[in-house]
UniProtKB/Swiss-Prot annotation:
The name this protein goes by in its record: CinA-like protein
Pfam families hit by this protein: CinA (PF02464), CinA_KH (PF18146), MoCF_biosynth (PF00994)
NCBIfam families assigned: cinA_nterm, PncC_domain, PRK00549.1
Domain of life: Bacteria
Length: 434
C-alpha cells in the first residue's frame, strides 16, 4: 500500500481537549480500529490533539508526510473551538467555500427538530474547495472526504459516537472497499475464559500464539482472560473458515474454561442456559451489594429468568428476609459456607426460583482477620439437585471493586458449570469440584 514516497497505512486523529483531559473515554478510536481491521486496512497510529488550530495544522501535515489516509473524529460542530475543517484546509493552504447543499440540509434538519439554525451553525457548511461531502444521517455536522494531494486523503467525522458510526457504515466503509487500499479481508473473534490465568492459558496454546494466520493474542480484562483470533483472506468466507478452525482447536484444548465469544458475558450465557431449560434464578448478596444482580439485569430479556434478589448486608436482614438462623451466625459468622448456603436456600424459598446464588465475604479494605482475611468470599449455588458452597480467596491488593467484580463472575461461572453438568448427567458434587 506504500506509494513512491513511502507513505502507507491509515492513521486516526481524535480531536478534542476533553479527550486530553480524560473527561470522556475515547471509544471512537477503539471502534475505528476494529472497523479498519475488518476491512483489511493497515492501521499504524492513533493520535489525540486538543482544540488548538496551530497544533492541528502541524499534526495534519506530519500525518500527510507518512500516511496515505487520515481519519479524524471531533471538531465539526458550530462552536468556535470546532476547528477541524478549518485546520485541515489551512494545512494545505486551500480556501473554504460555503456549500449551498450542505447548508440546505442543515437548515432542514434543524427545522424538523423545531428550531431555526443560528448564524454560528453556518460554519458547518464550510468545506475546502474540492472536498466531497460525507452526509450525516443522524446529526447536522457533515463530514468530508478530500484528497488535497495525489497521495493523501482525509475523511472527517463528528465526535458523537452514534453519528460517527452511522456515517461510517453509510459512506466511509463503502468508500474504503472501493479504494483499492485494502490488503484483504480481516475477520476477528474473541473467545472468553473464566477460571484460568492469562499465563497458564498462554502456555497451553503456545503453538497457536506463534502462528501468523490466523493470529491468536491473549489479554486479560475484568477477571477473565480473552483470546482474540484474527484471520486475513481474500474474502470473508475464507477468513471466517480460518477463524472457525482455530476456534474449534482452542475449545477442544480448553474445554469448559471457555464460556463464550465476543459479546457473550457470563451473565448472558447463564441466562441463556436457564431460558432454554425453562428455569428461573434469584440472588442473595452481601459483599457484592447488588453487583451480581446488576450483571444479570444488564442483559436484555433477563426478566424472563431472574425473579429477584436480596441485598442482605446486615445480619438482621439475613435472618428476617432470608431465614438464616441467628444461632448459625453466632456459631460460624456471616462469612462462612453454612451462611452462604442458608442465604441461597432462603432466597430460593422466598422467590420460588429454581436456582439461587448467594455471596458473603469481606471485600475490604478493612474488616479482615487472620482467620478471615480481606478477599475471602463464600459462594453458594442452590438448585433442584441440592446446595453447595465453597470459598474463594482473592488478592486484597487488587482492591474492593475488583474483589466484588470477580466474586460476582465466579458465582455466575459456578452456576454455569452446574447447569452444564446437569445437562450432561453429571452430579452437582462433580460440577462443584471442577
Amino acid at each position: 500500500m506504500a506509494d513512491a514516497a513511502g507513505r502507507s497505512g491509515v492513521e486516526v486523529l481524535c480531536i478534542g481537549t476533553e479527550l486530553l483531559l480524560g473527561n470522556i473515554v475515547n471509544g471512537n478510536a477503539r471502534w475505528l480500529a476494529e472497523e479498519l481491521a475488518a476491512l483489511g486496512l493497515p492501521h499504524f497510529r492513533q493520535t489525540v490533539v486538543g482544540d488548538n488550530r496551530d497544533r492541528l495544522i502541524a499534526e495534519v501535515r506530519e500525518i500527510a508526510s507518512r500516511s496515505r489516509v487520515l481519519i479524524t473524529t471531533g471538531g465539526l460542530g458550530p462552536t468556535p473551538d470546532d476547528l477541524t475543517t478549518e485546520a485541515i484546509a489551512a494545512a494545505f493552504q486551500t480556501p473554504l467555500e460555503e456549500r449551498a447543499d450542505v447548508w440546505a440540509d442543515i437548515t432542514a434538519k434543524s427545522r424538523s427538530r423545531g428550531r431555526e439554525p443560528g448564524p454560528e451553525t453556518r460554519r458547518q457548511a464550510l468545506l475546502p474547495v474540492g472536498a466531497t461531502v460525507l452526509p450525516n444521517p443522524t446529526g447536522t455536522a457533515p463530514g468530508m472526504v478530500w484528497s488535497p494531494t495525489d497521495h493523501f486523503t482525509v475523511l472527517t467525522f463528528p465526535g458523537v459516537p452514534s453519528e460517527m458510526r452511522a456515517m461510517w457504515q453509510a459512506t466511509a466503509a463503502p468508500w474504503f472497499r472501493q479504494s483499492g487500499l485494502s490488503s484483504g479481508v480481516f475477520v476477528s473473534r474473541t473467545l472468553r475464559f473464566w477460571g484460568i490465568g492469562e499465563s497458564t492459558l498462554a502456555e497451553q496454546v503456545r503453538d497457536l500464539l506463534n502462528q501468523t494466520n490466523p493470529t491468536v493474542a491473549p489479554y486479560a480484562g475484568r477477571g477473565e482472560v480473552k483470546l482474540r483470533i484474527t484471520a486475513c483472506a481474500s474474502d470473508q468466507p475464507e477468513a471466517l473458515a480460518l477463524v472457525d478452525e482455530t476456534e474449534r482447536d482452542l475449545r477442544s484444548r480448553t474445554g469448559d474454561l471457555c464460556f463464550g465469544a465476543d459479546e457473550a458475558s457470563l451473565a448472558s450465557v447463564v441466562l441463556a442456559h436457564l431460558r432454554a431449560r425453562g428455569e428461573t434464578l434469584a440472588v442473595a448478596e452481601s459483599c457484592t451489594g447488588g453487583g451480581l444482580g446488576a450483571e444479570l439485569t444488564a442483559v436484555p430479556g433477563s426478566s424472563q429468568v431472574l425473579l429477584g434478589g436480596v441485598i442482605a448486608y446486615a445480619n438482621a436482614v439475613k435472618c428476617e428476609l432470608l431465614g438464616v438462623p441467628s444461632s448459625l451466625l453466632e456459631e460460624v459468622g456471616a462469612v462462612s459456607d453454612p451462611v452462604a448456603q442458608a442465604m441461597a436456600e432462603g432466597v430460593r424459598r422466598l422467590t420460588g426460583s429454581d436456582w439461587a446464588l448467594a455471596l458473603t465475604g469481606i471485600a475490604g479494605p478493612g474488616g479482615g482477620s487472620d482467620e478471615k482475611p480481606v478477599g475471602l468470599v463464600h459462594i453458594a449455588v442452590a438448585g433442584p439437585d441440592g446446595c453447595e458452597s465453597h470459598p474463594i480467596r482473592l488478592a486484597a491488593s487488587q482492591g474492593r471493586d475488583w474483589i466484588r467484580l470477580v466474586s460476582a463472575g465466579e458465582a455466575l461461572n459456578r452456576l454455569r458449570l452446574r447447569l452444564m453438568a446437569a445437562e450432561s448427567g453429571q452430579t452437582h458434587t462433580e460440577a462443584e469440584g471442577h
